């Protein structure tokens, strides 16, 4: 078995990187519903996002000079990123956290492929008792869940990597109304997504993180700003 020609023929740096480093037998299970419906644009977007965030993670790992770490992926969905990290960093412990994983999904992936990936079925709002992690990652965090990812990172981790998705929260609207500097900055930006990301960076700073922002134009999505932070 190999990747479909619609993916193999796509000449893109991140897609080629992904294919070289991730076996199709695992990929075909994780992405089975999308492959069956031939949702190739969606699949390519997901692959590119995984590589974009993986590159940030890899740089942070290189700075720490160790490949032995604990990583939580919050709201992991199909957990493609978690599996990619588990495959490429076999000394790591990777935990995918989401509301529900099917028994078939868990048994197929845990027993057949990697022994360093684990699953927790829990609402992110109910997470109160995790062991400390080195990294917390979330891709596609929607609305106020992006704030909650930062809160959980502040509580349980030294680093976080976040790719926000849907925009807005009550705190964001209040912050825009009451923050004079933000209003001046926002008047110069005609992109609500970037405004939202700027707010989230400021929110993370208030939780004692040193923040970096990276726009990754190689990710096949308009929601391509990666926020990553280290606890001060």
Where are each of the predicted segments found?
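Class I S-adenosyl-L-methionine
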Residues: 1-232
């Amino acid at each position: 078995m190999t990747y479909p020609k619609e993916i193999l023929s796509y000449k893109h740096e991140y897609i080629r990187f992904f294919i070289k480093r991730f076996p199709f037998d695992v990929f075909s299970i994780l992405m089975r519903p999308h492959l069956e419906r031939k949702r190739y644009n969606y699949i390519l977007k997901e692959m590119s996002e995984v590589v974009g965030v993986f590159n940030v993670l890899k740089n942070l790992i290189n700075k720490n000079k160790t490949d032995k770490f604990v990583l939580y992926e919050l709201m992991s969905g199909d957990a493609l990123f978690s599996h990619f990290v588990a495959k490429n960093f076999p000394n790591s412990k990777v935990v995918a956290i989401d509301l529900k994983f099917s028994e078939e999904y868990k048994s197929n992936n845990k027993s057949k492929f990697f022994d360093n990936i684990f699953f927790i079925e829990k609402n992110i709002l109910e997470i109160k008792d995790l062991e400390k992690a080195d990294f917390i990652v979330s891709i596609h965090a929607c609305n106020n869940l992006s704030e909650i990812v930062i809160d959980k990172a502040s509580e349980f981790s030294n680093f976080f990597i976040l790719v926000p998705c849907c925009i807005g929260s009550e705190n964001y609207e209040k912050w825009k109304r009451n923050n004079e500097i933000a209003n001046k900055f926002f008047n110069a930006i005609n992109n609500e997504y970037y405004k939202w990301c700027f707010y989230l960076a400021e929110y993370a700073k208030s939780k004692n993180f040193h923040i970096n922002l990276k726009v990754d134009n190689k990710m096949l999505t308009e929601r391509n700003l990666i926020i990553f932070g280290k606890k001060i």
